[in-house]
Amino acid sequence: MTKYKLEYIWLDATRPYQTLRGKTQIKEFDAFPTLEQLPLWGFDGSSTLQAEGRTSDCVLKPVTVYPDPVRTNGALVMCEVMMPDAETPHASNTRATVLDDEGAWFGFEQEYFFYKNGRPLGFPEQGYPAPQGPYYTGVGYKNVGDVARQIVEEHLDICLAAGINHEGINAEVAKGQWEFQIFGKGSKKAADEVCVARYLLVRLTEKYGIDVEFHCKPLGDTDWNGSGMHANFSTAYLREVGGQDYFEALMAAFEKNLHDHINVYGPDNHLRLTGKHETAPWDKFSYGVADRGASIRVPHSFVNNAYPGYLEDRRANSQGDPYQMLLSS
């Protein structure tokens, strides 16, 4: 029997943005544990805004497990939060509301800033660095510094070793801003892996004395890009059949549900979706071929192939709850 370090990970009830929590327990197994072998576990919900002190117990229900490459005999256990009966989903548990669909494919582009001492990494103590332009996909110390690339490369390796379907990294438009991409076949798979990848990034930066800032517009009303979580999506029908009529009907449905979508695409999105910095205004729906200033970007390949394929919803922001985004798509 081997002692395994099980890191149980969940989303708390902090508002307006649910943050990730984690705690470790040790259990013995003959081999790396399967999901079915992982026990339920309790936690103090009064300290995560998920319960009151007089009835503080909440339950963690494992829903997926990955190897933890950072720890010897470690496991990363993504969990849903349940009520004390272990059967009723907690009100903050948005994952439980998602019907899994193996034909639904999602690719999330998670943007974020590195912060140190309250400012984006690479910014001077006062004022701003040179304007945007050289930083996107940039190389060289003056564009990306030294420690940022070290972190994103290490995060990439950790995710791949954990079995997360991490598809790539790049420096983003603003200095100190980066992106990673996660793809999943199946609604819940993609969202689970985004959450675990976020957790791994935040945990990794601890040893560098650096924070990860997921707010969508941390630099406010300035000439610096905000952070999104663009969602590339398709269904089996959209990939295999599609067609212009179906596409136009789909866009009409998206326009009709504009405000419902914006409500779950992350807090403070009005600060980011201004019509500037590669965004569409938050209160207007639009789509266009290769248009990064539209709500929905339509790839050239989609039109050239007679309208089967995938689409990109550019409105979701970097603090978006991926489970709620699945419900809106």
Swiss-Prot record:
Mg(2+) binds at residues 109, 111, 172, 179. Its EC number is 6.3.1.2. One of its GO terms (cellular component) is cytoplasm. Residues 89-329 form the GS catalytic domain. ATP binds at residue 167. The keyword Membrane does not apply. Keywords: ATP-binding, Cytoplasm, Ligase, Magnesium, Metal-binding, Nitrogen fixation, Nucleotide-binding, Plasmid. Signal peptide: none annotated. Catalyzes the ATP-dependent biosynthesis of glutamine from glutamate and ammonia. Belongs to the glutamine synthetase family. This is Glutamine synthetase. It comes from Rhizobium meliloti. The gene is glnII.
